[in-house]
A protein has these predicted regions:
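Conserved S-adenosyl-L-methionine
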Residues: 1-3, 164, 169-172
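SAM-dependent nucleic-acid methyltransferase catalytic core
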Residues: 17-152, 156-166
Length: 175
């Protein structure tokens, strides 16, 4: 979204991403009963396969369309998780038949594709041309050269009880 000043997702793009595709079953096979219900895992696999098959675009248009797709998918995945976290197996919080005193149940019960469409719409609304050349990069902070107006850092979650540097990243974030 930082660099993209004109490429938006179309309704045809959305239809293509939501088409049936059984090419992958990675999430379904590896994360059953951990984060999402079986049909939701299959939905994630379907959308991932369709994102990877967006080869009817090229260059930056393809790059930006995929970025919007991943953004919407990742946001939909986050919003469907209890407390938006992936560090524990707590699908039961969503599936338990108990009275709830907070509004997340409505969000959790809403279909993935509806969240996905909403985040596509949100991303499209944030595509604009400010007349400046914006650049986003994904490199080590130690390799950044030049002068920048904004630097966003997203360090991993650290485990303060780790015995060495290889154990510092919390192993509970496999998804």
């Amino acid at each position: 979204l930082i660099e993209n000043n004109k490429v938006r997702f179309t309704s045809e793009d959305l239809i293509n991403l939501l088409k049936e595709n059984n090419q992958f079953n990675f999430v379904y096979k590896n994360f059953r009963d951990i984060y999402y219900l079986d049909y939701e895992n299959k939905w994630i696999d379907k959308v991932m396969a369709n994102i990877l098959n967006m080869n009817h675009y090229t260059g930056t248009e393809l790059e930006y369309k995929k970025a919007i797709s991943y953004y919407a998918l990742f946001q939909a995945c986050l919003i469907k998780r209890p407390f938006n976290l992936f560090h524990r197996k707590n699908l039961y919080i969503r599936t338990n038949k108990v009275e709830r005193e907070f509004g997340n149940k409505i969000t959790w019960d809403k279909a993935f594709h509806l969240h996905f469409k909403n985040f596509i719409k949100e991303a499209n609304e944030h595509v604009f041309d400010n007349g400046k050349k914006c650049k986003a990069t994904n490199i080590s902070v130690f390799d950044i050269k030049g002068k920048y107006d904004l630097v966003y850092l997203d360090p991993p979650y650290l485990n303060k009880l780790a015995n060495n540097e290889h154990e510092t990243v919390d192993p509970g974030y496999p998804f």
